Amino acid sequence: MEDIFRYCLRPGDREVIKVSDQERESRKRKLKENVIFGEKEKENTEEEEQEGRSRASIRRKLSLPLVFLLLFFLGLLFFFYSKRRFSRISTRWTTAFSDKEGSSQEYFSFADGVVKLSKDGASYLSKTGKLIWNQAYEMGSPVVSINGDFMAIGEKSGSKLFILSTSGLVGQGESPLPIEKLSISGKGVVYALLSDKDSTYITVFSKEGRNLDIGIRSVMSGDGFPMDFSTSKDGEELLVAFSYLEQSVLKSRVVFYNFSSLGKNVGADRVVGGFTDNFSGKIVGRVHFFTNEESFVAYNGGLSFFSTRVKTSPEEKKQEGIEGTIRMICYNDSYLAVFADNTKDADKGKGNYRLLLFRKSGERLFDKPISYMGSKMEISGDKIFLYQEKTYQVYDFSGRLRYNGTTEDSLYYLRSASDFNLGGTELMLCFPNKVERVRIQ
């Protein structure tokens, strides 16, 4: 058949068939080569990918410990850097006062700056050195109370009352009896301790200075004398410490009042709780509301921390005894610092005094013997300051001494001025005729 087919072809057709056969053979060879070499290339690619994954895995295994080690050393470096004792000081700005303005009696922390208080008026200076407001008045001896963005200034043994905010004067009033003490709430409501010959009154004023005709009367021969008092942040609660004589023995009682609708329902006197046995033989010298629910009472011999979470049933949460005479206390919204004599024989060689810090819950953070005798103390930001005349010391909330400073002029007051304390901290130093902002690092 093939022979018949071959003889039927023309000469030119044979050549075409030969070429076609050659092309088929060529294509077969190329296909075989592609299959063989393609498989080899695929095998090579897979091997390379596997080697790449293996190398990446090794790099990850090596790099992760190195990263953790680096972070650990950086954290350790930051920890020791942030806890080191500061040794350098630089001045950021200085605001000077005239001789008349320099006759200041006192400085107080207010909002982010300080208030300079004198017989002729008060000035509010922000932490940037800007004078925000200046309130003129004439008072023989001004008394002040500050709570958040509000402050009250009254004339001791007089009747004038000024209520101010960070923006300036809010209200002004007159008291019917001489003013002894003030306590202002975080909303501007003012409680004023007024006195006459045989009685004392705690009267309430609105932030505009209007007498609200709400008050507490105590007869000194029976109820005793109010040693100190404090209102809560919202102005609805009042804590008062009374001292009284019983069989010729001086005693103390602490009374909680509530001036909201809850207190009104309790009774006409608005008393929701009282504590006497807790302070038997003690003299209560200071009381203060940290918040609307947490407060403390300071007496000779220790501290008591109270809760008014249940508004009609105050509760003593914790009592902390303090050996030695309590010389000074200071506080902010969250902490309470105490400066006392050191009576512990084991610590006598480390200092004659003790510095203690408590949370508002009553938790003791530290109790540290120190040798420096400051005449004033302030807690501000995350620092505690002890100072007198031309020297001051700065402690952190772990009890570490961070800076030991001196000044050329007598130091009236100081406070923290830092928003962020990485690598150092900034302070406002207040002198008779000027205020300085400095950085210690």
Give short role names for the model-derived ranges:
Residues 99-109, 137-149, 177-188, 221-230, ...:
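Repeated scaffold domains used in trafficking and secretory/extracellular systems
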Residues 233-236, 262-264:
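Secondary-structure boundary elements
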Residues 60, 65-76, 158, 199, ...:
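Terminal alpha-helical anchor/extension segments at protein ends
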Residues 75-98, 120-136, 158-174, 201-219, ...:
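Surface-exposed loop/turn elements that mediate protein-protein interactions on large endomembrane-trafficking
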Residues 105-118, 122-123, 144-156, 160-162, ...:
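Short beta-strand elements that form the blades of beta-propeller/WD-repeat-like
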Residues 1-44:
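N-terminal targeting leaders characterized by basic, low-complexity, disordered sequences
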